[in-house]
């Protein structure tokens, strides 16, 4: 979709996918600890700078452990530090086993996270890590992207507005043969149309 993506991993997530894989896909450095893992030239990974860099923050998968720490303000890894420092919209995609998903404490966690102003991406029904099948599977990546896109579009100031923009040269007849015109390229009209579309207009 053209977005510039930076990845922040938890220590546990590296047991499922390597930082190199995500770095290759995102074409950016992957952050997983407060300092770089190069022992010879370790550098501080400033969680505030990372948080302020993004226009939005997606936590996927959001495990029961991570979500409970988001609620309590626990800050024992880089991801949680970035979350607490983020001023941009935050989306989270829950992922856990069926019984964990249905547990009252999890429902309470959802409510508190949503009350904080975060956006919950609905979990899906499917095969779970336990081998069982049911609600709690993380939304598919394409569904996460679609959810975020729709949520952004719904908040745009020109949503559901229809705008007519003329572009290009104009001609005013003097008589059946002659006219007054101009050499307009239409670029201004195209620019206005693109700007209106980016604000949600049709």
Which role fits each region the language model picked out?
Residues 1-91, 98-186, 190-202:
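A cross-family phosphate/adenosyl-ligand binding-site feature
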């Amino acid at each position: 979709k053209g977005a510039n993506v930076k990845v922040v991993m938890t220590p546990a997530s590296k047991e499922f996918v390597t930082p190199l894989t995500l770095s290759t896909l995102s074409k950016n450095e992957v952050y997983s600890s407060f300092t770089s893992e190069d022992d010879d030239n370790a550098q501080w990974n400033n969680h505030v700078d990372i948080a302020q860099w993004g226009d939005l923050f997606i936590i996927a998968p959001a495990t029961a452990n991570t979500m409970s720490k988001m609620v309590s303000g626990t800050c024992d890894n880089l991801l949680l530090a970035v979350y607490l420092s983020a001023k941009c919209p935050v989306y989270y995609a829950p992922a856990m086993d069926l019984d964990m998903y249905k547990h009252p404490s999890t429902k309470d966690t959802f409510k508190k996270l949503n009350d904080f102003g975060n956006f919950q991406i609905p979990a899906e029904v499917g095969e779970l890590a336990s081998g069982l099948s049911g609600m709690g599977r993380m939304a598919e990546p394409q569904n996460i992207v679609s959810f975020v896109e729709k949520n952004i579009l719904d908040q745009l100031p020109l949503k559901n507005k229809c705008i007519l923009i003329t572009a290009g040269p104009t001609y005013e007849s003097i008589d059946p043969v002659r006219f007054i015109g101009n050499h307009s390229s239409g670029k201004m009209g195209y620019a206005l149309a693109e700007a209106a579309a980016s604000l949600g207009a049709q």
